[in-house]
C-alpha cells in the first residue's frame, strides 16, 4: 500500500493493545529481519508462481529460522495469527534447502541484480563478506566517556543491569552490545552520561594519531 514499515507498525501497535512491550520489540525485530532477507525468503515460492505477500514471507522465515522452537503445523485458525498453512505451501518449505542451493547469487546475498557489477567493483574481494553482513542486524556500539569512567567499570556496571557487552579490539573506547539493548536507555550508565550510542566508524575517526585533546572533529 506504500505505507512505511515504521508507520505500519505504529498503527498496528496502536490498534492491538494486547501486544506488550516485549511482544512489540519481538515483532519489530522479526519484521526487519524478514525485510533484510526478503529475496531468499520469497524465492522458493517465486519459482512456484506465487505472488509475494507478507504471509508467505513470514511462513518462510518461521520455517527457516524458528523451526527448532516452532512448528508451522501448530498454527490453528484464529483472528490473531496467520491462516493455517496449506499442504502445497508446506511441500515447498520442506524442499526449501534444494531451492536455496539453486538460487542465484543476488537472491542468496539479498541485493538487486542490476547493482552487482557496481557492488563488485566497489567492494572487490570483500563483496561476499560485506553482503552477508548486510543480511544481519547492524551491531550496536557504545562509546565510553573516558573523562568520567573506563571500559572495564562500565562493562561491569552494564552487566548488573542485564546489558551484556564485549570489548572491541578495533577501539579503545567502544563496547559492543551482545544482548539487553532494550534496557540501555533506563540504565544508570546511560542516564549519567557514562556511555552513549555511537557507530564504531565514528569512534575510530577520533582515535587516529593526528587527533589530540582539544581538537574539533567534523563527523
Stretch-by-stretch model annotation:
Residues 214-219:
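Conserved class I S-adenosyl-L-methionine
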Residues 142, 197, 205:
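Conserved hydrophobic/aromatic pocket- or pore-lining residues that grip, position, or stack substrates
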Residues 179-182, 195, 213:
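Active-site-adjacent "gating/activation" loops or surface patches in catalytic cores
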Residues 1-186:
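Class I Rossmann-like S-adenosyl-L-methionine
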Residues 188-196:
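Class I SAM-dependent methyltransferase Rossmann-like catalytic core
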Amino acid at each position: 500500500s506504500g505505507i512505511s514499515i515504521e508507520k505500519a507498525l505504529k498503527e498496528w501497535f496502536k490498534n492491538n493493545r494486547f501486544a506488550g512491550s516485549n511482544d512489540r520489540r519481538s515483532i519489530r525485530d522479526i519484521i526487519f529481519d524478514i525485510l533484510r532477507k526478503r529475496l531468499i525468503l520469497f524465492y522458493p515460492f517465486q519459482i512456484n508462481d506465487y505472488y509475494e505477500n507478507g504471509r508467505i514471507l513470514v511462513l518462510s522465515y518461521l520455517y527457516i529460522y524458528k523451526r527448532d522452537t516452532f512448528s508451522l503445523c501448530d498454527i490453528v485458525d484464529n483472528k490473531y495469527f496467520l491462516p493455517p498453512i496449506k499442504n502445497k505451501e508446506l511441500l515447498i518449505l520442506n524442499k526449501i534447502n534444494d531451492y536455496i542451493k539453486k538460487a542465484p547469487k543476488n537472491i542468496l546475498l539479498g541485493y538487486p541484480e542490476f547493482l552487482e557489477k557496481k557492488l563488485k567493483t566497489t567492494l572487490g574481494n570483500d563483496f561476499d563478506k560485506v553482503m552477508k553482513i548486510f543480511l544481519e542486524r547492524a551491531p550496536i556500539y557504545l562509546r565510553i566517556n573516558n573523562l568520567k569512567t573506563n571500559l572495564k567499570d562500565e562493562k561491569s556496571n552494564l552487566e548488573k543491569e542485564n546489558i551484556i557487552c564485549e570489548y572491541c579490539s578495533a577501539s579503545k573506547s567502544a563496547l559492543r552490545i551482545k544482548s539487553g539493548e532494550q534496557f540501555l536507555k533506563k540504565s544508570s550508565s546511560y542516564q549519567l552520561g557514562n556511555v552513549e550510542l555511537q557507530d564504531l566508524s565514528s569512534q575510530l575517526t577520533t582515535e587516529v594519531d593526528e587527533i589530540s585533546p582539544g581538537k574539533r572533529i567534523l563527523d
